[in-house]
Amino acid sequence: MMKGYITLSFLIILIFNFLDEFAASTRHLCDPDQSDAILEFKNEFETLEESCFDSNIPLKTESWTNNSDCCYWDGIKCDAKFGDVIELDLSFSCLRGQLNSNSSLFRLPQLRFLTTLDLSNNDFIGQIPSSLETLSNLTTLDLSRNHFSGRIPSSIGNLSHLIFVDFSHNNFSGQIPSSLGYLSHLTSFNLSYNNFSGRVPSSIGNLSYLTTLRLSRNSFFGELPSSLGSLFHLTDLILDTNHFVGKIPSSLGNLSHLTSIDLHKNNFVGEIPFSLGNLSCLTSFILSDNNIVGEIPSSFGNLNQLDILNVKSNKLSGSFPIALLNLRKLSTLSLFNNRLTGTLPSNMSSLSNLKLFDATENHFTGPLPSSLFNIPSLKTITLENNQLNGSLGFGNISSYSNLTVLRLGNNNFRGPIHRSISKLVNLKELDLSNYNTQGLVDFTIFSHLKSIEYLNLSHLNTTTTIDMYEILSSFKLLDTLDLSGSHVSTTNKSSLSNSSLVLISQLYLSGCGITEFPKFLRSQELMLTLDISNNKIKGQVPGWLWMLPVLNYVNLSNNTFIGFERSTKLGLTSIQEPPAMRQLFCSNNNFTGNIPSFICELPYLSTLDFSNNKFNGSIPTCMGNIQSPYLQALNLRHNRLSGLLPENIFESLISLDVGHNQLVGKLPRSLSHISSLGLLNVESNKISDTFPLWLSSLQELQVLVLRSNAFYGPIEKTQFSKLRIIDISGNQFNGTLPANFFVNWTAMFSLDENEDQSNGETMSNMYMSTDYFYFDSMVLMNKGVEMELERVLKVFTVIDFSGNKFEGEIPKSIGLLKELHVLNLSNNALSGHIASSMGNLMALESLDVSQNKLSGEIPQELGKLTYLAYMNFSHNQLVGLLPGGTQFQTQKCSSFEDNHGLYGPSLEKICDIHGKTPQQSDMAPEPEEDEEEVISWIAAVIGFILGTALGLTFGCILFSYKPDWFKNPFVRDKRRNIGTITH
């Protein structure tokens, strides 16, 4: 009886529950007030159907009508029991407009039950109104991929139920509000791809349930808060591409659930914390492009789930970490651009799932482990620019290899190339450049590589002549070929027609002993890049070259060309597209006559180098008439050009060099309109003008060279805030230099104080978009010795006012220029005392104030300038004790001669070495001493240049591939720790 009663009661409860659910599902769910509020919200914005992501997909709002239940509208979800709208999803709805504080979304209480608001992937603008806090039940807020701007309102801290927040891919700025710490239920927080700045608030450590933190691609700075170590549920920590500094917190090693860490492109220093080896769930660790030192911790051998390890472009040292061989799941290992040494382990095949191994630009030695070629999954091996040596062996390559990229260039391999390389039939990229083959090479071994697209066999040190027709007929997919430095035959010795040759896009034949212009090029309709520099090609450049439809980089430098076919007109018809030429290098040839006017028919030209030829006549007037939006570098130096500089020159120029010609007249005032101009060099001409003070309006001007002309008159206080090199020597400037003359030359004050180097946005980045560099050069004059600097370096700062008629005292403001390296004020009429403020020039390496009327003592402060390698105080009226610094004691006696009042132990030591005193000014210096001085000066300057950290140039670049002769243009300064720019 009791059992039956219980069963009946249970059935009654089930029936009532069913009826309740049935009633809920059949009644009208959407409250009309909520429906009206949603429609009002939609009408606040413009719908742009033409800019929709997919015009074939109907818009969500098309189903929103007055006579239908809003709970069935697309993007709307209602509470099943009470009918309240709880989710509003308008993602991908092609909406444009501003989210106002009085929007119905916040103003009307009918929408207060919303838990999800998704406005992602639209075109919303403006700021987030603080009235957002009225949606107090929100758990999900997604505003990603719009154009929102401004700051995150601090009122967001009142949305205490938030679990998911995504503001990525907008234009937000400002700091993260500390009120974020009140969102105690938050699990995912994404601010990536915005303009946020400031420090990450320590209150972020209060988000104890956070699993995902993404702050990448912003401008956050400062150290990471140690409170990050309290986020014990964190799985993804993505902080790349910011300006974070300091050490990586060791407390991150406590976050045992972490699967992904990405800290690349910041300014972290110190060592990788050993504690990170405790992260047993970690699958991806990316730390590239920082300033990390030390070794990869041996504890990383415990990360048995690790799939990606990328520590490229740091300062890591030590040997290859053997512990990494325990990582059986590792697929990507990038050690590129560090300071790792020693040999690579022989048992690399332990990394059985490895797909990419990149150890380029380190200091590895020893043989290449053949075990690498026994890893079936391996697709990419890049080991360029190391010191690997021995013969190149490929081990027991299986009949089927997955290897697609093998780059071993610029090592010390020697011996024959093993035929087993022909088994790598899936290779798409092969670089064996600078391989010392020590004899003949059988190039047929490469003919089996039918998939090859990129082939670099430059500088193989072989006596074999490479037949271009055989090479181009063997590879049907070849796109880039570099045979530079090898002997190449471009003559068709077979029955092959040009139509049977593969059409490639990039060809490098520099220094190949070629004597005639390659005729097969005429049919290369897909050619983008052509380098036939450093050969022995004579005659004229064929006119058909400019008709190749997509050719945009040509290097003809260092040949013996004498002219151009069709030098006046290209002969384009009205329906032909103009040539695509962007960079043209023709320096160091024997071109004569006028500059060809067809240059003006190349509307996309960005770099033109005609330097070191025999062009004469005037610069074509058409170069002044064409308003090219592309031309950035124009180099006409060392020719025989005459006449005036064109009044209207290209307004997009970054670098203009017309030095060593016979130009006359004045500098065209239109130069002041070239707002992008960074380098102006008119040295060694016959220009007669006053100092171009009007160039102060050029905010990007960094190099100004007026030396050896006929400039005249006084110079007033200038405003060159970015000037790094100024050479006005050998002119007729006169007058006094005001005491505050240098106060606005802030670029020479201090790199640390005036430039934010943390983001890497320095001189090179302003002018470079890819990897082709154009180098500016200049000439320094000192004591009659000219030295040509082939590259203008960002950290190289020079002031040369020598050989003029300046009077008065050296401006005391010279002491502000703490980053000045070369100062030459010689051969003027300067008087008074040498300013003691010159003791502040801590970077100074060369000082010449000879041949003036300076009096008083040499400031003792100069003895503390530890980098001062060359100095000359001769032929003045100096007196007193010579400073006793080491740098003074290494100078020549002649550096102080004709200063009868100088004395002291340092002077006696210097002059006793050479058997004379500085008072013997009437005696001619011995030739040996002159030679030693010249050699000392050259060594000082060249030593500085070669030792300077990462030279940065004015550049014009067009392609993604980098020629060998541009790959490593600069070396590090071992004496001075100046930061470098990333690869």
From Swiss-Prot:
Principal subcellular localization: membrane
Record topology, Extracellular segments: 26-937
Domain of life: Eukaryota
SUPFAM superfamilies: L domain-like, RNI-like
Coiled coil: none
Signal peptide: 1-25
Protein's cellular compartments: Cell membrane
Alphabetically ordered keywords of this record: Cell membrane, Glycoprotein, Leucine-rich repeat, Membrane, Receptor, Repeat, Signal, Transmembrane, Transmembrane helix
CC terms in the record's Gene Ontology section: plasma membrane
Its membrane topology: Single-pass type I membrane protein
Glycosylation sites: 66, 102, 137, 158, 171, 190, 195, 206, 254, 278, 347, 389, 396, 402, 456, 461, 492, 498, 555, 558, 590, 616, 734, 744, 824, 872
Family: Belongs to the RLP family.
Protein name according to UniProt: Receptor-like protein 19
Species annotation: Arabidopsis thaliana (Mouse-ear cress)
